[in-house]
């Protein structure tokens, strides 16, 4: 990449139409019906799964958004893109597409899924909801799954449709309290992680799921065309605001999902990485009958080369910026700052599986300096997922700084050891 582009960020900005010439781009992208809630905060967007995802809002700093997610409650309108797969052969198609056994997904449950090309490279991932006996939604991350369904459905009695459903996430320790307040049914306390249900909110039937992209307690709401999204969205925001809710953008999710080891499609995995390489091998069922990519995955190297990384007093540059003994050994695929751990956090994809957690490396950071960093397991904390399941209800009131025990410079000692 040319050096003049290295520190340039490209974004999509909302533009008010003026004059008699319409802005065609504004209508070539599907807009979340609650985008108007973001407009007062000078939003910037990126293109994501044929939709927009909010990258920046002016109402709170990235650190403030992070702490709202970890201590209180946030609302985020996502770019997730659900497609509907229905018909007598819907299950057969999905069994071809995904490497997990879809027959195990019962109505009322969700399942994390990803699809692979024939060579084992990952297309994208997302959340599969079994809506009915022969009807599924797959709320996908960035990537083209619609064409993949079409290309692999020959000879099957199946419909692949765009249901025009939009997804918002409500995340944080107070999220289930808000849901209990908003819906008529008293199901929130009975729900398990990855359950979904149709509930009544302000007289409307809506689908909500016990899922999210923060690994904090939370839920998602799926706005269907028949829903009054504006009324429901304003209700959620107004009632949530009484609990401290704010609307957030990507920064609120990035830190928590990196700490939790939740991978981002197109960044932490691509069509050039197979599931085993990035630590997703547990979601591949090689005992299952044939699925796309099975042969390649059977023959693939099963070792993991993707790890977390904590950086001393810096934010790692994305790209080929990790060195060990003055030799490049891998890439930073995601990075940000963790206000809770008081260090840079990231996801690293290494060139070899022989290097792993506990290794101290050098990383080029956004301040153009080299910082010490340590590879670690993912998730970085809460390995049993007790926070997202509502088992661990402890809400941190302050930062709990990470200390690189293997790096003992005077500067690190003074700042991190006190």
Model-flagged regions — what are they?
Residues 79-81:
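Low-complexity, highly charged intrinsically disordered N-terminal segments
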Residues 84:
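Active-site bordering "gate/hinge" segments
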Residues 2-69, 129-409:
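Conserved, structured C-terminal
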Residues 407-418:
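Single conserved hydrophobic/aromatic residue that forms the stacking wall/gate
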Residues 88-124, 175-204:
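Internal amphipathic helical hairpin motif
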């Amino acid at each position: 990449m040319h050096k003049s582009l290295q520190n340039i960020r490209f974004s999509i900005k909302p533009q008010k139409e003026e004059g008699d010439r319409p802005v065609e781009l504004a209508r070539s992208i599907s807009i979340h019906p609650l985008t108007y809630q973001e407009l007062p905060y000078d939003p910037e967007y990126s293109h994501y799964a044929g939709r927009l995802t909010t990258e920046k809002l002016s109402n709170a700093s990235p650190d403030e958004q992070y702490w709202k997610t970890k201590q209180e409650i946030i609302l985020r309108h996502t770019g997730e893109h659900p497609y509907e797969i229905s018909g007598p052969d819907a299950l057969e198609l999905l069994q071809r597409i995904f490497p997990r056994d879809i027959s195990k997904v019962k109505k009322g449950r969700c399942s994390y899924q990803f699809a692979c090309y024939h060579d084992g490279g990952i297309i994208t991932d997302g959340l599969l909801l079994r809506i009915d006996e022969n009807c599924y939604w797959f709320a996908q991350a960035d990537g083209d799954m619609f064409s993949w369904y079409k290309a692999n459905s020959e000879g099957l009695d199946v419909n692949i449709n765009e249901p025009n459903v939009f997804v918002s996430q409500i995340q944080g320790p107070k999220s289930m309290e808000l849901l209990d307040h908003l819906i008529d049914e008293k199901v929130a306390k009975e729900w398990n992680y990855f359950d979904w249900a149709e509930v009544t909110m302000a007289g409307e039937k809506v689908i909500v799921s016990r899922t999210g992209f923060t690994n904090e307690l939370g839920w998602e709401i799926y706005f269907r065309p028949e829903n009054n999204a504006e009324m429901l969205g304003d209700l959620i925001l107004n009632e949530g605001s009484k609990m401290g809710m704010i609307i957030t953008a990507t920064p609120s999710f990035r830190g928590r999902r990196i700490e939790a080891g939740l991978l981002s499609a197109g960044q932490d995995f691509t069509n050039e990485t197979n599931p085993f390489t990035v630590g997703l091998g547990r979601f591949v069922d090689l005992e299952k009958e044939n699925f796309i990519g099975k042969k390649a995955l059977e023959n693939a190297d099963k070792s993991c080369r993707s790890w977390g990384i904590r950086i001393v007093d810096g934010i790692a540059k994305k790209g080929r910026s990790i060195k060990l003994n003055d030799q490049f050994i891998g890439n930073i695929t995601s990075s940000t700052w963790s206000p809770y751990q008081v260090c840079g956090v990231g996801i690293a994809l290494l060139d070899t599986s022989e290097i792993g957690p506990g290794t101290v490396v050098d990383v080029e950071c956004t301040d153009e300096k080299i910082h010490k960093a340590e590879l670690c397991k993912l998730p970085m904390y809460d390995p049993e997922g007790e926070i997202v399941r509502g088992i661990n209800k402890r809400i941190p009131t302050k930062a709990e700084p990470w200390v690189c025990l293997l790096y003992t410079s005077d500067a690190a000692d003074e700042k991190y050891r006190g």
